[in-house]
Swiss-Prot record:
Its EC number is 3.4.21.92. It is found in: Cytoplasm. The active site is at 116 (nucleophile), 141. The gene is clpP. Cleaves peptides in various proteins in a process that requires ATP hydrolysis. Has a chymotrypsin-like activity. Plays a major role in the degradation of misfolded proteins. This is ATP-dependent Clp protease proteolytic subunit.
């Protein structure tokens, strides 16, 4: 068996195990009994989970859920729970742009950790409705790249990374209220914050220990 096939098999087994561990919710109605996985049931309450690596497949699922909930009710808030190490910039920006595109306001709640693109999306929530649980951690840093190939291609990719970094810094400055030059300095290396520090920095608006009436 090739290394590629082995990796695919391991990934499939992991996905199958995770799927088997998803709790099911059974509801009774006049029409009978219906079963939902827990995430589908929470989606009915306008709750979306952004957990794990930010990549294209996950971004497509998040975007689809945002658009679906907008179609269901364009005037009611959506709650995006985040526990993510970050990932692809393009995938993250697809989610970010959709959050801004739709009519409902999107509140963001960090549980566990929001790092890299995860912290970017945490800050992207509706101002006044960005939260972190008491022991959550947040980390911001600059985008990374691993360009290979001819020297000219590497140079082109380097320019693109710098352009992307500048754009992300501008957005973070707007979302946090921090000067762009401070953002540029802070993201040069991994910049870690606890929940209280994330509030002081402007990445979130409130630290939560108990559920407020608005959530």
């Amino acid at each position: 068996m090739s290394a590629h096939t082995t990796a695919q098999s391991a990934q499939y087994n992991q996905s199958a195990t995770q799927a088997a561990l998803v709790p099911m919710v059974v509801e009774q109605s006049a029409r009978g009994e219906r079963s939902f996985d827990i995430f589908s049931r929470l989606l009915r309450e306008r709750v979306i989970f952004l957990t794990g690596q930010v990549e294209d497949h996950m971004a497509n699922l998040i975007v689809a859920q945002l658009l679906f909930l907008e179609a269901e009710n364009p005037d009611k808030d959506i709650h995006l729970y985040i526990n993510s190490p970050g990932g692809s910039v393009s995938a993250g920006l697809a989610i970010f742009d959709t959050m801004n595109f739709i009519k409902p306001e999107v509140s963001t709640i960090c549980m566990g950790g929001a790092y890299s693109m995860g912290s970017f999306l945490l800050a992207a929530g509706e101002k006044g409705k960005r939260y972190a649980l008491a022991n959550a951690r947040v980390m911001i840093h600059q985008p990374s790249g691993g360009a290979q190939g001819q020297a000219t291609d590497i140079e082109i990719n380097a320019r693109e990374i710098l352009k992307t970094r500048a754009r992300l810094n501008e957005i973070l400055a707007e979302r946090t209220g921090q000067p762009v030059d401070k953002i540029e300095k802070d993201v040069e290396r991994d910049y870690w914050l606890d929940a209280k520090e994330a509030k002081e920095y402007g990445l979130i608006d409130e630290v939560l220990e108990r559920r407020p009436a608005s959530l």
